[in-house]
Each structure stands twice: as structure tokens, then as C-alpha cells.
């Protein structure tokens, strides 16, 4: 299990009141991405954030929509699921999405929670999606990371 050593930061209920967060979620492997989005939305709303879900076709479409969302949202959560196949396409997609999301966050100074799963098997994805049989909840974790980072940046700006 890869959850060993996970962060312990939590967000107090209601502490993100007034924060606008977009969830950009791909439709490939929808059984996984729907669960990721549900878990992320629940975490955001519990924290008090105003959450908007924006669907995209696949993982490669996530970065451009995330970049646009940084213009109107305080934080963005990127969710998707890329599962290893028999070609190098997996590596290209995973690298492009990860690089794109990191670059967007740094350039725009807008938090981007990365909940794009990159798994070898469907079973690994299920185990990370936050459903009833999952050992991890990457959708909620990405939301918590985005909200916490937004709160941190806001407090740094106030200093």
C-alpha cells in the first residue's frame, strides 16, 4: 500500500468559506473519476468552499482547462485516471499532465491539487479512489492540498 507516510494536515469544517474551487475531472475510466470527483467535492463542501465540477474528455485536456480555471477560481483540483497499457502512451500522458499541472500552479500562483491517478492496474485505481473498499482517498487528498495551499498563500500575502 502506498499510503504509508501520508500527510496529516486536515482542513477544519467551514474554514474555507468564501473560497471558490474548481474540480477539473476527465471522463476516461469514469467509474474511478466519478468517485474521485465525489470525494473531492464532499471534502471541499465540508470545508465550506464553493465547488464547481468541470468535466473534460481525457487526461491530456486537464491542463488547459485547469489553466483557464486559475483565472476565476482560488484553487483548482485536477482529477483523472490513467491506467498502464501496452504502449508508451501511458508514460507520455502521465508526464505531460504532471508537468503541465505543476507549471500552471507555479506560473499562476494558484494552487492545483493533483489527483490524477497513474496506475498499473484498474485495481490500484479502485484502491486509491476513496470508495467503500479503498485504502486511500486521492480525490479528497487533492482537495485538501488545494485548499490548504490557498489558505497558506493567503496568509503569506497578509504578512
Swiss-Prot record:
Top-level EC class: transferase
Keywords linked to the UniProt accession: Riboflavin biosynthesis, Transferase
Binding site for 5-amino-6-(D-ribitylamino)uracil: 28, 59-61, 81-83, 114
Pathway membership: Cofactor biosynthesis; riboflavin biosynthesis; riboflavin from 2-hydroxy-3-oxobutyl phosphate and 5-amino-6-(D-ribitylamino)uracil: step 1/2
Active site: 89
GO biological process: riboflavin biosynthetic process
GO MF: 6,7-dimethyl-8-ribityllumazine synthase activity
GO cellular component: cytosol; riboflavin synthase complex
Annotated function: Catalyzes the formation of 6,7-dimethyl-8-ribityllumazine by condensation of 5-amino-6-(D-ribitylamino)uracil with 3,4-dihydroxy-2-butanone 4-phosphate. This is the penultimate step in the biosynthesis of riboflavin.
Similarity field: Belongs to the DMRL synthase family.
Name listed for the protein in its UniProt record: 6,7-dimethyl-8-ribityllumazine synthase
Species of origin: Corynebacterium kroppenstedtii (strain DSM 44385 / JCM 11950 / CIP 105744 / CCUG 35717)
The organism's taxonomic lineage, starting at the top: Bacteria, Bacillati, Actinomycetota, Actinomycetes, Mycobacteriales
Amino acid at each position: 500500500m502506498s499510503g504509508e507516510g501520508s500527510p496529516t494536515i486536515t482542513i477544519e469544517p467551514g474554514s474555507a468559506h468564501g473560497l471558490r474551487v474548481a474540480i477539473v475531472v476527465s471522463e476516461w475510466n469514469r467509474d474511478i473519476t466519478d468517485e474521485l470527483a465525489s470525494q473531492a467535492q464532499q471534502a471541499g463542501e465540508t470545508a465550506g468552499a464553493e465547488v464547481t465540477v468541470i468535466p473534460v474528455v481525457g487526461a491530456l485536456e486537464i491542463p488547459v482547462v485547469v489553466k483557464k480555471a486559475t483565472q476565476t477560481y482560488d484553487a483548482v483540483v485536477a482529477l483523472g485516471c490513467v491506467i498502464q497499457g501496452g504502449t508508451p502512451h501511458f508514460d507520455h500522458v502521465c508526464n505531460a499532465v504532471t508537468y503541465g499541472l505543476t507549471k500552471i500552479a507555479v506560473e499562476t500562483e494558484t494552487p492545483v491539487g493533483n489527483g490524477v491517478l497513474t496506475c498499473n492496474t484498474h485495481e490500484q485505481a479502485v484502491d486509491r479512489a476513496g470508495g467503500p473498499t479503498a485504502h486511500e482517498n486521492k480525490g479528497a487528498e487533492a482537495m485538501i492540498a488545494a485548499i490548504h495551499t490557498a489558505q497558506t498563500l493567503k496568509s503569506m500575502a497578509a504578512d
